Regions:
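Extracytosolic (periplasmic/ER-lumenal) interhelical loops and adjacent juxtamembrane/interface segments
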Residues: 49-50, 221-231
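Intrinsically disordered, low-complexity regulatory segments in eukaryotic proteins
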Residues: 216-218
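Multi-pass membrane glycosyltransferase architecture that uses lipid-linked
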Residues: 2-212, 237-361
Length: 361
Protein backbone atom coordinates (compact mmCIF):
# COMPACT_ATOMS: atom_id res chain seq x y z
CA UNK A 1 0.00 0.00 0.00
CA UNK A 2 1.38 3.41 -0.98
CA UNK A 3 2.30 6.06 1.58
CA UNK A 4 -0.02 9.07 1.81
CA UNK A 5 0.48 12.44 3.45
CA UNK A 6 -2.10 13.05 6.18
CA UNK A 7 -3.02 16.36 4.56
CA UNK A 8 -4.28 14.44 1.54
CA UNK A 9 -6.47 12.31 3.81
CA UNK A 10 -7.90 15.40 5.48
CA UNK A 11 -8.54 17.10 2.15
CA UNK A 12 -10.22 14.02 0.68
CA UNK A 13 -12.34 13.51 3.81
CA UNK A 14 -13.47 17.14 3.72
CA UNK A 15 -14.40 16.81 0.05
CA UNK A 16 -16.43 13.67 0.77
CA UNK A 17 -18.26 15.37 3.63
CA UNK A 18 -18.92 18.44 1.51
CA UNK A 19 -20.40 16.21 -1.16
CA UNK A 20 -22.47 14.46 1.52
CA UNK A 21 -23.66 17.86 2.75
CA UNK A 22 -24.76 18.82 -0.76
CA UNK A 23 -26.59 15.62 -1.68
CA UNK A 24 -28.70 15.83 1.49
CA UNK A 25 -29.16 19.61 1.45
CA UNK A 26 -32.85 20.15 2.31
CA UNK A 27 -33.45 23.05 -0.10
CA UNK A 28 -32.52 20.99 -3.16
CA UNK A 29 -35.51 19.47 -4.91
CA UNK A 30 -33.76 16.15 -5.53
CA UNK A 31 -31.99 15.86 -2.16
CA UNK A 32 -31.39 12.36 -0.81
CA UNK A 33 -33.17 11.61 2.47
CA UNK A 34 -31.28 12.37 5.70
CA UNK A 35 -32.32 11.64 9.28
CA UNK A 36 -30.95 15.02 10.27
CA UNK A 37 -33.53 16.82 8.16
CA UNK A 38 -36.35 14.59 9.40
CA UNK A 39 -35.52 15.52 13.02
CA UNK A 40 -36.22 19.18 12.22
CA UNK A 41 -39.79 18.46 11.22
CA UNK A 42 -40.43 16.26 14.24
CA UNK A 43 -40.42 19.16 16.68
CA UNK A 44 -36.94 20.64 16.70
CA UNK A 45 -38.21 23.35 14.36
CA UNK A 46 -40.27 24.56 17.33
CA UNK A 47 -37.25 24.48 19.66
CA UNK A 48 -38.87 21.81 21.82
CA UNK A 49 -36.64 20.22 24.46
CA UNK A 50 -35.91 16.58 23.65
CA UNK A 51 -36.86 14.05 26.34
CA UNK A 52 -38.92 16.66 28.22
CA UNK A 53 -41.16 18.29 25.63
CA UNK A 54 -40.37 15.94 22.76
CA UNK A 55 -39.91 12.17 22.61
CA UNK A 56 -36.61 11.30 20.97
CA UNK A 57 -35.32 7.78 20.38
CA UNK A 58 -31.59 8.52 20.61
CA UNK A 59 -29.54 8.80 23.83
CA UNK A 60 -29.25 12.18 25.60
CA UNK A 61 -26.12 13.66 24.02
CA UNK A 62 -27.55 12.99 20.56
CA UNK A 63 -30.71 14.86 21.48
CA UNK A 64 -28.70 17.74 22.93
CA UNK A 65 -26.69 18.10 19.71
CA UNK A 66 -29.87 18.14 17.63
CA UNK A 67 -31.43 20.69 19.98
CA UNK A 68 -28.33 22.91 19.94
CA UNK A 69 -28.33 22.83 16.15
CA UNK A 70 -31.99 23.81 16.05
CA UNK A 71 -31.38 26.74 18.42
CA UNK A 72 -28.39 27.96 16.41
CA UNK A 73 -30.28 27.57 13.13
CA UNK A 74 -33.38 29.62 12.47
CA UNK A 75 -34.63 27.52 9.58
CA UNK A 76 -34.07 24.04 8.22
CA UNK A 77 -31.11 25.09 6.06
CA UNK A 78 -29.14 26.81 8.82
CA UNK A 79 -30.05 24.04 11.29
CA UNK A 80 -28.79 21.47 8.80
CA UNK A 81 -25.60 23.46 8.25
CA UNK A 82 -24.85 23.77 11.97
CA UNK A 83 -25.51 20.06 12.46
CA UNK A 84 -23.23 19.29 9.50
CA UNK A 85 -20.41 21.39 10.96
CA UNK A 86 -20.65 19.43 14.22
CA UNK A 87 -20.48 16.16 12.30
CA UNK A 88 -17.58 17.39 10.16
CA UNK A 89 -15.57 18.44 13.22
CA UNK A 90 -16.23 15.06 14.83
CA UNK A 91 -15.28 13.24 11.66
CA UNK A 92 -11.98 15.12 11.36
CA UNK A 93 -11.25 14.05 14.93
CA UNK A 94 -12.03 10.48 13.87
CA UNK A 95 -9.63 10.81 10.94
CA UNK A 96 -6.85 12.14 13.18
CA UNK A 97 -7.36 9.42 15.78
CA UNK A 98 -7.37 6.70 13.14
CA UNK A 99 -4.20 8.12 11.59
CA UNK A 100 -2.48 8.02 14.98
CA UNK A 101 -3.57 4.42 15.54
CA UNK A 102 -2.27 3.49 12.08
CA UNK A 103 1.06 5.18 12.78
CA UNK A 104 1.41 3.40 16.12
CA UNK A 105 0.68 0.09 14.42
CA UNK A 106 2.96 0.88 11.46
CA UNK A 107 0.06 0.58 9.04
CA UNK A 108 0.16 2.53 5.79
CA UNK A 109 -1.98 5.67 5.83
CA UNK A 110 -3.25 4.67 2.41
CA UNK A 111 -5.80 2.53 4.24
CA UNK A 112 -7.07 5.56 6.14
CA UNK A 113 -7.45 7.41 2.85
CA UNK A 114 -9.47 4.62 1.26
CA UNK A 115 -11.70 3.70 4.18
CA UNK A 116 -12.25 7.13 5.76
CA UNK A 117 -12.27 9.44 2.74
CA UNK A 118 -13.04 7.50 -0.42
CA UNK A 119 -15.61 4.98 0.78
CA UNK A 120 -19.07 5.56 -0.74
CA UNK A 121 -20.58 5.15 2.73
CA UNK A 122 -18.71 8.25 3.89
CA UNK A 123 -20.19 10.28 1.04
CA UNK A 124 -23.72 8.97 1.49
CA UNK A 125 -23.96 8.64 5.26
CA UNK A 126 -21.51 10.97 7.03
CA UNK A 127 -23.93 13.94 7.02
CA UNK A 128 -26.90 11.74 7.81
CA UNK A 129 -27.25 10.78 11.47
CA UNK A 130 -25.19 10.61 14.67
CA UNK A 131 -23.05 7.66 13.56
CA UNK A 132 -19.98 9.67 12.54
CA UNK A 133 -20.02 11.42 15.93
CA UNK A 134 -20.46 8.09 17.72
CA UNK A 135 -17.59 6.52 15.78
CA UNK A 136 -15.37 9.48 16.59
CA UNK A 137 -15.93 9.15 20.35
CA UNK A 138 -15.60 5.36 20.25
CA UNK A 139 -12.35 5.28 18.29
CA UNK A 140 -10.89 8.06 20.46
CA UNK A 141 -11.77 5.96 23.50
CA UNK A 142 -10.07 2.94 21.94
CA UNK A 143 -6.98 5.00 21.10
CA UNK A 144 -6.52 6.25 24.66
CA UNK A 145 -7.27 2.78 26.02
CA UNK A 146 -4.38 1.39 23.99
CA UNK A 147 -2.24 4.27 25.30
CA UNK A 148 -3.17 3.16 28.84
CA UNK A 149 -4.88 6.47 29.58
CA UNK A 150 -7.73 4.62 31.23
CA UNK A 151 -9.66 7.52 32.76
CA UNK A 152 -9.82 9.53 29.55
CA UNK A 153 -10.75 6.42 27.59
CA UNK A 154 -13.59 5.66 30.00
CA UNK A 155 -14.96 9.21 29.78
CA UNK A 156 -14.93 9.06 25.97
CA UNK A 157 -16.52 5.61 26.13
CA UNK A 158 -19.35 7.07 28.22
CA UNK A 159 -19.75 9.93 25.74
CA UNK A 160 -20.06 7.39 22.92
CA UNK A 161 -22.78 5.62 24.90
CA UNK A 162 -24.65 8.88 25.31
CA UNK A 163 -24.78 9.16 21.52
CA UNK A 164 -25.52 5.54 20.67
CA UNK A 165 -25.89 2.75 23.18
CA UNK A 166 -24.14 0.07 21.14
CA UNK A 167 -20.63 0.45 22.54
CA UNK A 168 -21.73 -0.96 25.91
CA UNK A 169 -21.31 -4.48 24.49
CA UNK A 170 -17.57 -3.74 24.27
CA UNK A 171 -17.21 -2.98 27.97
CA UNK A 172 -16.62 -6.55 29.25
CA UNK A 173 -13.99 -7.16 26.56
CA UNK A 174 -12.19 -3.92 27.39
CA UNK A 175 -12.30 -4.68 31.11
CA UNK A 176 -10.68 -8.08 30.53
CA UNK A 177 -7.69 -6.34 28.94
CA UNK A 178 -6.99 -4.34 32.08
CA UNK A 179 -4.37 -5.77 34.42
CA UNK A 180 -6.01 -5.34 37.82
CA UNK A 181 -9.48 -5.44 39.31
CA UNK A 182 -8.93 -1.89 40.52
CA UNK A 183 -8.48 -0.68 36.93
CA UNK A 184 -11.46 -2.70 35.77
CA UNK A 185 -13.67 -1.27 38.50
CA UNK A 186 -12.48 2.28 37.79
CA UNK A 187 -13.13 1.90 34.07
CA UNK A 188 -16.61 0.47 34.66
CA UNK A 189 -17.54 3.17 37.19
CA UNK A 190 -16.43 6.01 34.92
CA UNK A 191 -17.96 4.49 31.80
CA UNK A 192 -21.30 3.61 33.34
CA UNK A 193 -21.40 6.30 36.02
CA UNK A 194 -21.51 9.29 33.68
CA UNK A 195 -23.89 7.51 31.34
CA UNK A 196 -26.11 6.40 34.21
CA UNK A 197 -26.18 9.79 35.92
CA UNK A 198 -27.37 11.62 32.81
CA UNK A 199 -30.05 9.05 32.09
CA UNK A 200 -31.18 8.95 35.71
CA UNK A 201 -31.60 12.72 35.78
CA UNK A 202 -33.76 12.65 32.65
CA UNK A 203 -35.79 9.72 33.98
CA UNK A 204 -36.51 11.66 37.18
CA UNK A 205 -37.60 14.69 35.16
CA UNK A 206 -39.66 12.55 32.79
CA UNK A 207 -40.72 9.05 33.93
CA UNK A 208 -41.56 8.18 30.31
CA UNK A 209 -37.98 8.87 29.21
CA UNK A 210 -36.78 5.25 29.26
CA UNK A 211 -39.79 4.03 27.32
CA UNK A 212 -39.69 6.80 24.72
CA UNK A 213 -35.94 6.65 24.19
CA UNK A 214 -34.70 3.10 24.73
CA UNK A 215 -37.71 0.79 24.73
CA UNK A 216 -38.82 2.52 21.53
CA UNK A 217 -36.20 0.46 19.70
CA UNK A 218 -37.47 -2.79 21.19
CA UNK A 219 -40.79 -2.15 19.43
CA UNK A 220 -39.17 -1.41 16.07
CA UNK A 221 -39.54 -4.00 13.33
CA UNK A 222 -36.93 -5.73 11.20
CA UNK A 223 -35.00 -3.29 9.02
CA UNK A 224 -32.27 -4.46 6.64
CA UNK A 225 -31.64 -7.60 8.69
CA UNK A 226 -30.45 -10.55 6.61
CA UNK A 227 -32.65 -13.00 8.54
CA UNK A 228 -35.78 -11.31 7.19
CA UNK A 229 -35.72 -14.26 4.76
CA UNK A 230 -36.71 -16.50 7.70
CA UNK A 231 -39.20 -14.06 9.23
CA UNK A 232 -40.94 -12.29 6.34
CA UNK A 233 -44.21 -11.72 8.20
CA UNK A 234 -44.55 -8.98 10.80
CA UNK A 235 -46.40 -11.44 13.01
CA UNK A 236 -43.15 -13.41 13.39
CA UNK A 237 -40.92 -10.46 14.25
CA UNK A 238 -41.06 -11.01 18.00
CA UNK A 239 -39.55 -14.43 17.36
CA UNK A 240 -37.05 -12.80 15.01
CA UNK A 241 -35.89 -10.54 17.84
CA UNK A 242 -35.27 -13.58 20.04
CA UNK A 243 -33.30 -15.09 17.17
CA UNK A 244 -31.38 -11.81 16.95
CA UNK A 245 -30.50 -11.97 20.65
CA UNK A 246 -29.37 -15.59 20.30
CA UNK A 247 -27.11 -14.67 17.36
CA UNK A 248 -25.60 -11.79 19.31
CA UNK A 249 -24.86 -13.91 22.39
CA UNK A 250 -23.44 -16.72 20.27
CA UNK A 251 -21.28 -14.35 18.25
CA UNK A 252 -19.91 -12.55 21.32
CA UNK A 253 -19.16 -15.91 22.94
CA UNK A 254 -17.21 -16.95 19.85
CA UNK A 255 -15.21 -13.71 20.02
CA UNK A 256 -14.48 -14.32 23.70
CA UNK A 257 -13.41 -17.92 23.12
CA UNK A 258 -11.28 -16.89 20.13
CA UNK A 259 -9.25 -14.59 22.37
CA UNK A 260 -7.97 -12.03 19.88
CA UNK A 261 -4.47 -10.85 20.66
CA UNK A 262 -4.97 -7.74 18.53
CA UNK A 263 -7.41 -5.34 20.19
CA UNK A 264 -8.40 -3.47 17.04
CA UNK A 265 -9.40 -6.72 15.35
CA UNK A 266 -11.35 -7.77 18.44
CA UNK A 267 -13.34 -4.51 18.49
CA UNK A 268 -14.04 -4.89 14.78
CA UNK A 269 -15.25 -8.46 15.30
CA UNK A 270 -17.56 -7.43 18.15
CA UNK A 271 -19.14 -4.61 16.14
CA UNK A 272 -19.44 -6.83 13.07
CA UNK A 273 -21.19 -9.47 15.18
CA UNK A 274 -23.60 -6.84 16.45
CA UNK A 275 -24.37 -5.55 12.95
CA UNK A 276 -24.94 -9.05 11.59
CA UNK A 277 -27.10 -10.15 14.51
CA UNK A 278 -29.17 -7.02 15.12
CA UNK A 279 -32.69 -6.81 13.73
CA UNK A 280 -31.99 -3.24 12.64
CA UNK A 281 -28.93 -2.61 10.46
CA UNK A 282 -29.27 0.86 9.01
CA UNK A 283 -26.69 1.65 6.31
CA UNK A 284 -25.01 4.49 8.23
CA UNK A 285 -23.90 1.97 10.86
CA UNK A 286 -21.16 0.83 8.47
CA UNK A 287 -19.32 4.03 9.45
CA UNK A 288 -18.52 2.38 12.79
CA UNK A 289 -16.25 -0.26 11.28
CA UNK A 290 -14.44 1.75 8.58
CA UNK A 291 -11.77 3.22 10.92
CA UNK A 292 -11.15 -0.25 12.34
CA UNK A 293 -10.64 -1.70 8.86
CA UNK A 294 -8.15 1.09 8.19
CA UNK A 295 -6.25 0.39 11.41
CA UNK A 296 -6.21 -3.35 10.70
CA UNK A 297 -4.12 -2.62 7.62
CA UNK A 298 -5.87 -4.88 5.17
CA UNK A 299 -7.99 -4.53 2.07
CA UNK A 300 -10.57 -7.33 2.11
CA UNK A 301 -11.95 -8.07 -1.34
CA UNK A 302 -15.55 -8.31 0.02
CA UNK A 303 -15.23 -4.68 1.15
CA UNK A 304 -16.04 -3.50 -2.35
CA UNK A 305 -19.23 -5.57 -2.43
CA UNK A 306 -20.09 -4.34 1.06
CA UNK A 307 -19.81 -0.71 -0.02
CA UNK A 308 -21.75 -1.24 -3.23
CA UNK A 309 -24.62 -2.96 -1.43
CA UNK A 310 -24.63 -0.47 1.43
CA UNK A 311 -24.82 2.45 -0.98
CA UNK A 312 -27.63 0.95 -3.00
CA UNK A 313 -29.85 0.52 0.06
CA UNK A 314 -30.53 4.25 0.39
CA UNK A 315 -30.46 4.88 -3.36
CA UNK A 316 -33.17 2.26 -3.91
CA UNK A 317 -35.11 2.90 -0.70
CA UNK A 318 -37.55 5.44 -2.06
CA UNK A 319 -37.77 3.69 -5.41
CA UNK A 320 -39.45 0.70 -3.76
CA UNK A 321 -43.15 0.66 -2.74
CA UNK A 322 -42.30 -1.16 0.50
CA UNK A 323 -38.52 -1.09 1.07
CA UNK A 324 -38.59 -3.18 4.27
CA UNK A 325 -40.49 -6.02 2.60
CA UNK A 326 -38.75 -9.23 1.63
CA UNK A 327 -38.19 -9.18 -2.13
CA UNK A 328 -37.69 -5.43 -2.40
CA UNK A 329 -34.45 -4.15 -3.92
CA UNK A 330 -33.17 -2.62 -0.65
CA UNK A 331 -33.55 -5.97 1.10
CA UNK A 332 -31.71 -7.81 -1.67
CA UNK A 333 -28.84 -5.38 -1.22
CA UNK A 334 -29.08 -5.74 2.57
CA UNK A 335 -28.69 -9.50 2.13
CA UNK A 336 -25.66 -9.01 -0.12
CA UNK A 337 -24.17 -6.55 2.37
CA UNK A 338 -24.55 -9.05 5.20
CA UNK A 339 -22.82 -11.74 3.15
CA UNK A 340 -19.90 -9.41 2.37
CA UNK A 341 -19.54 -8.32 5.99
CA UNK A 342 -19.68 -11.93 7.15
CA UNK A 343 -16.85 -12.80 4.76
CA UNK A 344 -14.76 -9.92 6.14
CA UNK A 345 -15.54 -11.10 9.68
CA UNK A 346 -14.39 -14.61 8.80
CA UNK A 347 -11.14 -13.23 7.42
CA UNK A 348 -10.54 -11.36 10.66
CA UNK A 349 -11.61 -14.28 12.85
CA UNK A 350 -9.38 -16.84 11.19
CA UNK A 351 -6.57 -14.41 10.43
CA UNK A 352 -6.59 -14.87 6.65
CA UNK A 353 -3.96 -12.53 5.25
CA UNK A 354 -3.10 -11.67 8.87
CA UNK A 355 -3.88 -8.34 10.44
CA UNK A 356 -1.59 -5.58 9.36
CA UNK A 357 0.17 -7.77 6.80
CA UNK A 358 1.10 -4.67 4.85
CA UNK A 359 3.29 -2.49 7.06
CA UNK A 360 5.11 0.66 6.14
CA UNK A 361 8.88 0.55 6.13
Amino acid sequence: MMQVDRRIIYSAALCSMLFSYLIHYPRFSNAIYSDIVSFWYRGFNKARLPYLDLAFEYPPLAGFLAYASSIAGRDVSSYYTVFSIIIAASYLLLVETTIRICEDRRVSLGYALIFLALSPSVILYSIYNFDAIFASALIASLYFFMKRRIKLSAILFSIAGLIKLVNLILLPFLALRLESWRERLLYAILSLGIFGAVNLALWILNPSFIDETYLYHARWGLENAWFLIFFPSESSWDLAKLFSLFLLCYGLLKVYVRGFEDQVTEVFAILAVFLLSNYVFTPQMVLWILPLLAAMGRMPIPYFGLELANSMIILMWFESPNPVELGSLPQYFALLRALMLFMILLEAYFGFGRVGSERKD
